[in-house]
Amino acid sequence: MFGGAHELSIDSKGRLAVPAKFRDILSRLYTPAVVVTLESKHKLLMYPVAEWEKVAAQLLNLKVADNPVLRRFQNLLLHNAEILEWDSAGRVLVSAGLRKRVDFDREVVLVGRANRLELWGREQWEAEMVQALDDDPDELAFQLSQTDLQL
């Protein structure tokens, strides 16, 4: 399971140094490669290949014929998926194609989220954290009461 947030920089060649903590999990539990794809203009998703295969199968099974929003989302994730392997320095090369689609460039936060990693622009990540911390606790408690989640 991935967890934690790491402030990093993408270098001028598009390389991102993956923290040793994440590389270790990938090496021990998966393969030393990730599939990176575009989720929105604010973040990229990075999955171990085995986890991505599960997600891709679910995406392909979506009923999208009469739902253009879901079809576009399905296409966004599947069409932009790329396999990345790290080099001897523990870096992955984020393609120019993916980098031009997101609204961040160099300063990023790589976040562990259970079965995947998320790559956010630092400003977008900070804004997301501020919003989460500013959410009304009573509204959150109500929303959580409507789920099966037990913390």
From Swiss-Prot:
Record keywords: Cytoplasm, DNA-binding, Repeat, Transcription, Transcription regulation
Location of the SpoVT-AbrB domain: 5-51, 81-124
Annotated InterPro entries: MraZ (IPR003444), MraZ_C (IPR035644), MraZ_dom (IPR020603), MraZ_N (IPR035642), MraZ_sf (IPR038619), SpoVT-AbrB_dom (IPR007159), SpoVT-AbrB_sf (IPR037914)
Organism domain of life: Bacteria
GO molecular function, one term: transcription cis-regulatory region binding
UniProt GO cellular component terms: cytoplasm; nucleoid
Location in or out of the cell: Cytoplasm, Nucleoid
One GO term of the biological process aspect: negative regulation of DNA-templated transcription initiation
Pfam family, one: MraZ
CDD domains on file: MraZ_C (cd16321), MraZ_N (cd16320)
PROSITE patterns: SPOVT_ABRB
NCBIfam families with a match to the protein in the record: division/cell wall cluster transcriptional repressor MraZ
Subunit description: Forms oligomers.
PANTHER family, per database record: TRANSCRIPTIONAL REGULATOR MRAZ
Family under the similarity heading: Belongs to the MraZ family.
Protein name per the record: Transcriptional regulator MraZ
Originating species: Neisseria meningitidis serogroup B (strain ATCC BAA-335 / MC58)
Gene: mraZ
